[in-house]
Curated annotation (Swiss-Prot):
It comes from the Eukaryota. GO terms for cellular component: chloroplast. InterPro entries: Domain_X (IPR024937), Maturase_MatK (IPR002866), Maturase_MatK_N (IPR024942). It is found in: Plastid, Chloroplast. This is Maturase K.
Amino acid sequence: MEEFQVYLELNRSRRHDFLYPLLFREYIYALAHDHGLNKSMIFLENQGYGNKFSSLIVKRLIIRMDQQNHLIISANDSNQNSFFGHNNNLYSQMISSGFAVIVEIPFSLRLVSYSQGEEVAKSHNLQSIHSIFPFLEDKFSHLNYVLDVLIPHPIHLEILVQALRYWVKDASSLHLLRFSLYEYCNLKSFITPKKSISILNTRLFFFLYNSHAREYESIFLFLRNQSSHLRSTSSGVFLERIYFYGKIEYLVEVFYNDFQNNLGLFKDPFIHFIRYQGKTILASKDTPLLMNKWKYYFVDLWQYYFYMWSQSGRVRINQLSKYSLDFLGYLSSVRLNPSVVRSQMLENSFIIDNAMKKLDTRIPIISLIGSLSKAKFCNTLGHPISKPTWADSSDSDIIDRFVRICRNLSHYHSGSSKKKSLYRIKYILRFSCVKTLARKHKSTVRAFLKRLGSEFLEEFFTETEDEHVFSLIFPRVFFTSRKLYRGRIWYLDIICINALVNHE
């Protein structure tokens, strides 16, 4: 770790020129190994990589790379000219994990120098997934339409390599990355949403994908900013559109590669852009015709600049008042909240009907039950079933597992507008736990509950520490029996999507 810190203190002008030699350092692979262990602890999963890692294998890998005279081997001749011998998969996993650590160094250096600035405020809470929903509550109620964009996957590996050329200036590292991708990955099925990648390191894969997505985001954000700062132009050229829009103020010409279009971008301070997983949301107060303009701009940008085949069907225009957006485990929509105000003036009284827009966040109960069914907690109809694979554990371990899953889901879906769906999920997990314990003790559910009583499962509905704080602040909105808070709560400590929520 000390050598890694020493490298970070190198001269800024030469930092990016020394990435490739780090592949011959053992501590790089130790860092990658430690990161894999930390990730497995966070997700409570055994990745199996720790059993294969050893310093002896790392030394053998470094010796093989040091003795190799050339790295450029044709992808078609990869079987005849094997670079690592019979341990191709293991060595390629180690190289990709080490490269994932190395390629992030320029970004880490930039982050360190950025955080040392005096004007930078601490924003650790913005790392939470829930931090986006208060923003949506403030902004989406004033918007009309949303573009639901499915980001296309690159059809060629070279696109991913080219996306890094602007950030990583080390040609040797880029050649090694290109060689690894062509040598060990199938070009036709490398990036598919339903196909797991066993050879390429997951950390490296997400880094490449985010770098690729950032390329088109930077172009889009540039156009978005220019649309609000360009000088006013004469509306005489757009006489045929005055009837529909009134005076049009802004026009920008974009020239990128062979893609040349005149895009009439109109000043719109109410446009918001969000990217999550493999999707993008573009919400605006524009008219449907303007949203169509953005739709076909995305398609043309992907096809002519990024050479990715995309269809207009991947970009859908929806009205927020009539459409529920499947977003980070919530179904979000804008609904009208009616209210009646009675006004008394002397002897006359007036009743005023008022309707305000409000962001409604609900739990996608059907998809969540599908995730529970896939995990063998219930059937496809939502009826609880036993978990036979856990029946060999102790009673306390079984109860602890179910309670932990239940509380994690409650913690993640605490921002739901309607708690009824959340209670149903708790019911499924509660009785799945009972059936698992009854199966272990070879008894029926009724006999098991009669013998031990139902009080031992009250942990599923007991008040958590956070809910206790809210009960002290808002005592009137809590139930006297169960003390469950009905309002929406957004937590600032959620850094990843729950595995059951991310059913895709």
